[in-house]
Amino acid sequence: MASTASVSTSTASSELSSLSNNINNAADISVIVIYFVVVMAVGVWAMLKTNRSTVGGFFLAGRSMTWWPMGASLFASNIGSGHFVGLAGTGAASGIAVTAFESHSFALLLVLGWIFVPIYIKAGVMTMPEYLKKRFGGKRLQIYLSILFLFICVILTISADIFSGAIFIKLALGLNLYLAILILLAITAIFTITGGLASVIYTDTVQAVIMLVGSFILMVFAFVEVGGYESFTEKFMNAIPSVVEGDNLTINSRCYTPQPDSFHIFRDPVTGDIPWPGTAFGMPITALWYWCINQVIVQRCLCGKNLSHVKAACILCGYLKLLPLFFMVMPGMISRILYTDMVACVVPSECVKHCGVDVGCTNYAYPMLVLKLMPMGLRGLMLSVMLASLMSSLTSVFNSASTLFTIDLYTKIRKKASERELLIAGRLFVSVLIVTSILWVPIVEVSQGGQLVHYTEAISSYLGPPIAAVFLVAVFCKRANEQGAFWGLMVGLVMGLIRMIAEFSYGTGSCLAPSSCPKIICGVHYLYFAIILFFVCILVILGVSYLTKPIPDVHLHRLCWALRNSKEERIDLDAEDKEENGADDRTEEDQTEKPRGCLKKTCDLFCGLQRAEFKLTKVEEEALTDTTEKPFWRTVMNVNVILLLAVAAFFYGYFA
């Protein structure tokens, strides 16, 4: 038995390693080198152009960004390499329904730009936990949410992107997995540590263009190869692997036959893999957390020149979010047509032979298209696309995570830290994240058998709804208080962890081997669980809040929707804490700073510490709370919202 397994594994290794020969040519390597040169050049330009020597400059780009790089960065930060692998893989397995996770985001982007960002800007905050501290007071909400956000970054974004990026690295370059990941993370960290948010956004913009151009070219090649859209819809329904029996297993035909509703977004509420009530009501809840509360996304909006630029960026990203169906999901489905025996394999021994994984090879759908369908030169372009999506997503996570650590956690440890110390701490924390990311790789490799999209969305459904509930109530119900918010989060955390730990312990199962997790815990689809969890948390928040003392309005001006336009002075709930730990006491180090040598000055220039000051400039302070718009541009934004909603309505009407 052991010898058989080793033979199968070696066969898979040789089969996969042979694909790396496809990219060992001057044309592909030249394209990849050019990609790295261009991205590094843009990163260096952004480092030199922008102010990185203040907290506002490093973490919020001095609130000087225009709409188009912001919109491109929102898209690039969201679309990691996990999307190319995960969306294409799930599309190959079950059809277009998975695109709902992407296309429904347009509505939440509008909610972000028109409702949440104005509140965040008027609150004058840099991080989402900081908003909760201003809104509710106390420290426990801010600290808890910061730690939870960092935990989610590691188990969701970083793990999914590194895993999916590793698939391309292994297939295309034949490099040692850990060496390749170390190189990528090192380059990614250089942008984040030295350049700040402005550098991240500008490199994101370049990488978004590369992603869109490359994935569009691959889509065209894929549709030409399959014979057009009509031929594609017909052939997909007949894409059944040649080997459907073996390993002494009785395999149900539904495990390898394309689903009858493969070309519909809305599916059966009971038997559907993505049930339509979950699509309609569960996805908006997880999307509310991701698009309106997630530090990675909101931080990009907080750096806009004004609110009109923020709204325009959200609209641009909304249009771009309609593209994954055509650029990722459908190419994954075409890969099943072209490479049916590998992508749609169902017999475990056959899957091991093709890709080394016994539960399926759908995650290899997109990489197979890139390496087998694209000609020389374009293969290098597509690998650059994968590197771009991986690096843009990771730079975004690293920058936002360092912001959370510095603003919400480090200042609690070092209450009198100088501005220079805060900047250095934020940069060093990125290094800690890199080490954590590398240590997480073996865990990701062990869990690589399932469909990546369902893994990420399930985790979001277990941890995201309590956060969404707290922020929604915080903005729209001024009666909510700190006790209600805290206990709502605690109840939600316990419920979410019970479900998540149970699934990790028993496994999520597959078509061949259903999970043995008790039905009372795991019997409800994760999107339905998100709905239940969300409303339970809201009930707890409101119930506890109405049973305890309310927060006086003097502490809530411009922190909630009802008082968003209030002109009265706000007394922050943490005002006493601020006085106790005032800036004057923590600046003695900077005031008595000794002259620095040439080497230290060069290092400071590289890291943006050469003009370190302990306060934001007056312009930055005013910009942080300014939400004024010119009437003309406000009207232009509102008209574009109507156009986007019309396009989205047609999209859902056609594919639902």
UniProtKB/Swiss-Prot annotation:
Q: Which residues cross the membrane?
A: 29-47, 65-85, 106-126, 172-191, 209-229, 271-291, 315-334, 424-443, 456-476, 527-547, 635-655
Gene3D superfamilies, sorted: Sodium/glucose cotransporter (1.20.1730.10)
A single GO molecular function, which one?
D-glucose:sodium symporter activity
Task: Give the main location.
Answer: membrane
Topological domains on the Cytoplasmic side lie at 1-28, 86-105, 192-208, 292-314, 444-455, 548-634
Q: Which GO terms describe its biological process?
A: proton transmembrane transport
Q: Which cysteines are joined by disulfide bonds?
A: none
Q: Explain the purpose of this protein.
A: Does not function as sodium/D-glucose symporter. Generates D-glucose-induced depolarization in a pH-dependent manner, with activity in acidic conditions (pH 5) but not neutral conditions.
PANTHER family in UniProt: GLUCOSE SENSOR PROTEIN SLC5A4-RELATED, SOLUTE CARRIER FAMILY 5
Q: What is this protein called?
A: Solute carrier family 5 member 4A
Provide the organism lineage as a comma list: Eukaryota, Metazoa, Chordata, Craniata, Vertebrata
